[in-house]
From Swiss-Prot:
Source organism: Peromyscus maniculatus (North American deer mouse)
Name of this chain's protein: Alcohol dehydrogenase 6
Gene3D superfamilies, alphabetized: Medium-chain alcohol dehydrogenases, catalytic domain, NAD(P)-binding Rossmann-like Domain
Cofactor note as given: Binds 2 Zn(2+) ions per subunit.
Keyword annotations of the record: Cytoplasm, Metal-binding, NAD, Oxidoreductase, Zinc
Catalytic activity as recorded in UniProt: a primary alcohol + NAD(+) = an aldehyde + NADH + H(+); a secondary alcohol + NAD(+) = a ketone + NADH + H(+)
């Protein structure tokens, strides 16, 4: 029996106030309006950004809110004017939209669509939500809210993927994998035969290593204080792994010595502001490129010795790996389907949506790299 045009009652993981655990709630999901798509979720990945945001007091005005921003699903129905997807299509959710019309989208050098401005409202459109919980307007984290059985999302924030795509694994491509892999491929432009150092070995850091390997790097040194992550790092392509706590001298000096005046490319993936200067100092003094991949809070000020730039180092940022999302994320899914890379080492746990708090705790404790939730 078709549900198109009808309100769908289903379950979602809802945050009622920052710092509280998520609760499974019944929600009502209204039909999509113009340029909107209603998606039956198949899988959702938990990203470190989700976990950081759970305790962020700035999220309070947007509660109740459905968390999650990585996901895949099947189109249940579409609103008027939708042309890029249709009912029954397999899709991936895009936490960074691509409208295809703004100056940024039309510029080949940029990927941060101007419609990303809605992300801070946590609404799918200007001032509106298609979801309610206990009669209250319910927000969707970064306009997505993938920890739900159904969501309504703007057409520019969803992309069709191949019919044979394995949605239960491909869900992490929408943010975590794309962010790390693209930081190496697009943002740093790692070159064949180069040397790389990656600081932080979570899911995104491991994806950076995979990107460095795919680009042909000759030497990839993984850096983390948790040695339990080293085996996985080597599985995805690290040639060496080091723990800064094992050395008496600063880790940047260790890497400088190991790589003949520093690495060609370094990546900061911990989200720790102090590590940014360390990563910058670890890259080659003349031509080294350091990419900030880890998410830093907007109020954090970086304190970096200006002399590090004197001889030619470059420090740059990277958002979602530099991908034009609606165009290029589906291509990554196709590459995964074609076995050009393997996501299995990244997905260490798969749980049902009602176990979301257990999954979050596993990630907080460092026992899990990436967890996939199945509604």
């Amino acid at each position: 029996m078709s549900t198109a045009g009808k309100v769908i009652r289903c379950k979602a993981a809802v945050l009622w106030k920052p710092g509280a655990p998520l609760t499974m709630e019944e929600i009502d999901v209204a039909p999509p309006k113009g340029k909107e798509v209603r998606v039956k979720m198949v899988a959702a990945g938990i990203c470190g950004t989700d976990i950081k945001s759970l305790d962020n007091k700035k999220l309070a005005p947007f509660c109740p809110i459905i968390m999650g921003h990585e996901g895949t699903g099947i189109v249940e129905s579409v609103g008027e004017g939708v042309s890029t997807v249709k009912t029954g299509d397999k899709v991936i959710i895009l936490c960074l939209p691509q409208c295809g019309e703004c100056n940024t989208c039309l510029n080949s050098k940029n990927n941060i669509c101007k419609e990303v401005r809605l992300s801070g409202t946590h609404l799918t459109s200007e001032g509106n939500s298609r979801i309610t919980c206990k009669g209250k307007t319910t927000y969707q984290y970064i306009t997505t809210g993938t920890f739900s059985e159904y969501i309504v999302i703007k057409e520019i924030s969803v992309a069709k993927v191949d019919e044979d795509a394995l949605l239960e694994k491909a869900c992490i491509i929408g943010c975590g994998f794309a962010t790390g892999f693209g930081a190496a491929i697009n943002s740093a432009k790692v070159s064949p035969g180069s040397t790389c150092a990656v600081f932080g070995l979570g899911g995104v850091g491991l994806s950076v290593i995979m990107g460095c390997k795919a680009a042909g790097a000759a030497r990839i040194i993984a850096v983390d204080t948790n040695k339990d992550k080293f085996a996985k790092a080597k599985t995805v392509g690290a040639t060496e792994c080091i723990d800064p706590q094992d050395f008496e001298k600063p880790i940047q000096q260790v890497l400088f010595d190991m790589m003949n005046d520093g690495a060609d490319f370094t990546f900061e993936v911990t989200g720790n502001p102090e590590t940014v200067e360390t990563a910058l100092a670890s890259c080659h003094k003349d031509h080294g490129v350091c990419v900030i991949v880890g998410s830093l809070a907007s109020w954090i000020q970086l304190n970096i010795n200006s002399h590090l730039f004197f001889s030619g180092r470059t420090l740059k940022g990277s958002v979602l790996g530099g991908w034009k999302t609606k165009e290029e994320i589906p291509k990554l899914v196709s590459d995964y389907t074609a076995k050009k890379f393997n996501l299995d080492p990244l997905i260490t746990h798969t749980l049902t949506l009602d176990k979301v708090n257990e999954a979050i705790q596993l990630m907080k404790n460092g026992q899990c790299i990436r967890c996939v939730l199945l509604p």
